[in-house]
Every structure is written in structure tokens, then in C-alpha cells.
Amino acid sequence: MQTKIKNKRVLVKFSGEALAGDNQFGIDIHVLDHIAKEIRSLVENDIEVGIVIGGGNIIRGVSAAQGGIIRRTSGDYMGMLATVINAVAMQEALEHIGLDTRVQSAIEIKEICESYIYRKAIRHLEKGRVVIFGAGTGNPFFTTDTAATLRAIEIGSDLIIKATKVDGIYDKDPNKFKDAKKLDTLSYNDALIGDIEVMDDTAISLAKDNKLPIVVCNMFKKGNLLQVIKHQQGVFSMVK
């Protein structure tokens, strides 16, 4: 008997660093292809998918501003452009395997992609297209986690999935500490006041105010995204 899928529309957030794979910079084509195939499994199961990708594999606004030459505002805008580069790369990977995809940018770049209009984004999703949201919120000083949460709320997502390199949320970094304990569920308040890194406080507060569940899972496990949406235990953590 097939497991019933409980979430029809989701937003998946990937970090830019994840696209670099084992490299320190750029885009690993093998990682890009893996992510595209994971997204295809969702679409094939009638899940409407929005995507937000960070830009840290190219440039991070905070890091760019540390040298004292580039102002934080300009650094953040540079980071937004990096997310558009990643969005276009992901669009190519998705279309390469047969998925109709649109990129919408919070900053107008009409020669490359659509400008973000939430009603148009929803219409694309209803038609079975994948929508990738680039350029963050379009404003400096906001993270792509906050942008992902904002877009998830605007398009009416059932949940937001933060796809990472670990199986969920831990009380400390599992890559550094062997005794790290996985936390299957966590309240918004615990995520806000604790030392546990899930998303930045703005993103979590926004999710809390709008009762949007946050799921953290391993993006590198084949089939894991679809399992998460089917609510199978043991492969994710949830903040709600």
C-alpha cells in the first residue's frame, strides 16, 4: 500500500556551499544533478516545489565586507547576485532531466529570469512547474534562510525543508562530536533561545508567527526528500 503524501506544496532550501560539494568554491555538477533528481521525485509524486538556494559557494556578503573595502550593503547585493547564478544553474539541471522550471528574482534581471511576483509563482506551481526564487528578499541584511521562510509563507507552503549534510538537528555539531544527540522535534522557542543552529532568529520567528513547520534533513541521502514529505520517522528533525 502506497504511503499517503501529506504535503502538497513545499519549499526546499539548499545552501550555496552544498552546491560546491567537496570543493571550496563554485558548482559541483554531480551535486547539482543529484539535487535535481531528488526534486524530480517530488514532482513525480504531485508535490509542488519551490526552491531557494544560498550563494555562499560564490560569495557571502558578511565575508566580503570584512576587509573594510566593500560595504556590507554592497556585499549583500553581491551575494544576492550569486544566488541568481545558482538558481540559473539549478534551472538548467532540472530542465535537463525534463522538469519545467522558472526562476524568479527579487531583483529585476529581465534578460535572465522573471521578476518575483507571488501570484505568478503560485500559478507556476499549480501548473506543475518548479519555481526557484533568487536574490534573497531583495534587501541587504537578510539571510537566504529568512528569504526562504518568507517565500514559503507567501506561496502557501505546507512546510519548509532545510536540506543539509546531516540527518536533522543535533544538540551539537555531529561532524565534530561523536556524542552529539539528534533532536527529532523542537519547539520554535527552543530553537530561538538555545545554542542549536537551525536558522537565524528572524527566519524562525517568521515561521513561528505563521505556524510554518521547519524540517531539517540530509540532502545527500538518495530518496530522503520524498521520505521526509511522507513523514517517515528517523530521517529528519522538525521545528514546530
Curated annotation (Swiss-Prot):
<dbReference type="GO" id="GO:0033862">
    <property type="term" value="F:UMP kinase activity"/>
</dbReference>
<feature type="binding site">
    <location>
        <position position="60"/>
    </location>
    <ligand>
        <name>ATP</name>
    </ligand>
</feature>
<feature type="binding site">
    <location>
        <begin position="137"/>
        <end position="144"/>
    </location>
    <ligand>
        <name>UMP</name>
    </ligand>
</feature>
<dbReference type="InterPro" id="IPR001048">
    <property type="entry name" value="Asp/Glu/Uridylate_kinase"/>
</dbReference>
<dbReference type="Pfam" id="PF00696">
    <property type="entry name" value="AA_kinase"/>
</dbReference>
<dbReference type="InterPro" id="IPR015963">
    <property type="entry name" value="Uridylate_kinase_bac"/>
</dbReference>
<keyword id="KW-0665">Pyrimidine biosynthesis</keyword>
<feature type="binding site">
    <location>
        <position position="173"/>
    </location>
    <ligand>
        <name>ATP</name>
    </ligand>
</feature>
<protein>
    <recommendedName>
        <fullName>Uridylate kinase</fullName>
        <ecNumber>2.7.4.22</ecNumber>
    </recommendedName>
</protein>
<dbReference type="GO" id="GO:0044210">
    <property type="term" value="P:'de novo' CTP biosynthetic process"/>
</dbReference>
<keyword id="KW-0808">Transferase</keyword>
<dbReference type="GO" id="GO:0005524">
    <property type="term" value="F:ATP binding"/>
</dbReference>
<feature type="binding site">
    <location>
        <position position="76"/>
    </location>
    <ligand>
        <name>UMP</name>
    </ligand>
</feature>
<dbReference type="InterPro" id="IPR011817">
    <property type="entry name" value="Uridylate_kinase"/>
</dbReference>
<comment type="subunit">
    <text>Homohexamer.</text>
</comment>
<feature type="binding site">
    <location>
        <position position="55"/>
    </location>
    <ligand>
        <name>UMP</name>
    </ligand>
</feature>
<feature type="binding site">
    <location>
        <position position="56"/>
    </location>
    <ligand>
        <name>ATP</name>
    </ligand>
</feature>
<feature type="binding site">
    <location>
        <position position="170"/>
    </location>
    <ligand>
        <name>ATP</name>
    </ligand>
</feature>
<dbReference type="GO" id="GO:0006225">
    <property type="term" value="P:UDP biosynthetic process"/>
</dbReference>
<feature type="binding site">
    <location>
        <begin position="13"/>
        <end position="16"/>
    </location>
    <ligand>
        <name>ATP</name>
    </ligand>
</feature>
<comment type="similarity">
    <text>Belongs to the UMP kinase family.</text>
</comment>
<keyword id="KW-0547">Nucleotide-binding</keyword>
<dbReference type="InterPro" id="IPR036393">
    <property type="entry name" value="AceGlu_kinase-like_sf"/>
</dbReference>
<comment type="function">
    <text>Catalyzes the reversible phosphorylation of UMP to UDP.</text>
</comment>
<keyword id="KW-0418">Kinase</keyword>
<feature type="binding site">
    <location>
        <position position="164"/>
    </location>
    <ligand>
        <name>ATP</name>
    </ligand>
</feature>
<keyword id="KW-0067">ATP-binding</keyword>
<comment type="pathway">
    <text>Pyrimidine metabolism; CTP biosynthesis via de novo pathway; UDP from UMP (UMPK route): step 1/1.</text>
</comment>
<dbReference type="GO" id="GO:0005829">
    <property type="term" value="C:cytosol"/>
</dbReference>
<keyword id="KW-0963">Cytoplasm</keyword>
